[in-house]
Amino acid sequence: MAVDTMESVAVVAVPFPAQGHLNQLLHLSLLLASRGLSVHYAAPPPHVRQARARVHGWDPRALGSIRFHDLDVPPYDSPAPDLAAPSPFPNHLMPMFEAFAAAARAPLAALLQRLSTSYRRVAVVFDRLNPFAATEAARLANADAFGLQCVAISYNVGWLDPGHRLLSDYGLQFLPPDACMSREFVDLVFRMEEEEQGAPVAGLVMNTCRALEGEFLDVVAAQPPFQGQRFFAVGPLNPLLLDADAPTTPPGQARHECLEWLDRQPPESVLYVSFGTTSCLHADQVAELAAALKGSKQRFVWVLRDADRADIYAESGESRHAMFLSEFTRETEGTGLVITGWAPQLEILAHGATAAFMSHCGWNSTIESLSHGKPVLAWPMHSDQPWDSELLCKYFKAGLLVRPWEKHAEIVPAQAIQKVIEEAMLSDSGMAVRQRAKELGEAVRASVADGGNSRKDLDDFIGYITR
């Protein structure tokens, strides 16, 4: 493709301001920039900083290929997560979500207007939770809007037709949004969708691949809301790392201590435990999980941290688990490692010593784990995570259920957790699940290689926006 054709097109990425959304669009932005496109990434200032600081799997110098823009929004409260809240949904983020929904449109419109005068074409790739971006793109004669699907495409099948044959054939249960999200968040999403209804969208970009969700892709493409749209299944967006036994950190940067620790462990001997950036465990549950890890006698890396605040740079103070950790780390020295800060998840999952992943089942974590051939011990917390847990355990057959969603308000006892850990790490049935995850990982890797379906869809997307 001619260089002048690429340079005459601007891509504007507009993420929703939460970690699991920020990083997907930044991964896509880096992919597109690596192909020679001019890419602009627009978010509130703390979230631009957050996305840049937390991206991993790329050479840090790659960030220089992206132009970052601040979408200024009014001040908002950034409280700590409410550990006493009746719902596990991170409702403490709602002040920020509301401020963003109300105020991000104007600075985005100004940015798009400015870019539209400098480029032949502007392609706006927006998180589907930001439908106002499509409306603003439609005001410009030389702009197209493309929604980014940040959750599994199969989630749309459950949303549109919970009784669909694919769900019943595999025994998949779809929970309505208000069962696993707060009423305030559901109301915000529906309100934004209603306000922007009718905004033209040229297509849908998806962080998935046919190797994982091919059947569901075909079903969704035939549904009335999506008929006539172009579908680009370009996932996984996360980089696919090689076995990280050898250091991959660029010269001059320190390698995370957990990777050095993993280097000293036998192959496929370590359980990685992390529940993402929007979930907290109650102190009683932390104690039960700790007892299970200790009792299983399995090696582990455990990321023990609370959910992000709206502004992660407003966080301060030591971990609330500090007293517990001083004793637990002493008791498990040599067997496990606890991380209370940010962890390099992709590198951990790619490491040859890592055997499995105990996870909240966010779509990022799900696809990152499968793309590196690692099974998931499923512990869904909120939002689309119960659905991802269903997919992992029943459809992909690459997961083991730790806690069913209907028991999300209960403390899971150590004995039950330990049983699943031992099944995953020691049993024949666990070995079968691990083998299935490896097979899926190989299929996912093939999809992004030359000639793979995801590579073709990425090429088609670039070809369309630079036409």
Swiss-Prot record:
GO terms for molecular function: cis-zeatin O-beta-D-glucosyltransferase activity; UDP-glucosyltransferase activity. An anthocyanidin binds at H21, N91. Belongs to the UDP-glycosyltransferase family. Optimum pH is 7.5. One of its GO terms (biological process) is regulation of cytokinin-activated signaling pathway. It comes from the Eukaryota. Highly expressed in root. Expressed at lower level in kernel and cob. Weakly expressed in leaves. Weakly or not expressed in stems. Utilizes UDP-glucose as the sugar donor and catalyzes the formation of O-beta-D-glucosyl-cis-zeatin from cis-zeatin. May regulate active versus storage forms of cytokinins and could have an impact on seed growth. The lineage of its organism: Eukaryota, Viridiplantae, Streptophyta, Embryophyta, Tracheophyta. UDP-alpha-D-glucose binds at A343, Q345, H360, W363, N364, S365, E368, D384, Q385. It catalyses: cis-zeatin + UDP-alpha-D-glucose = O-beta-D-glucosyl-cis-zeatin + UDP + H(+). This is Cis-zeatin O-glucosyltransferase 1. InterPro entries: UDP_glucos_trans, UDP_glycos_trans_CS. Keywords: Glycosyltransferase, Transferase. The active site is at H21 (proton acceptor), D127 (charge relay). Pfam families: UDPGT.
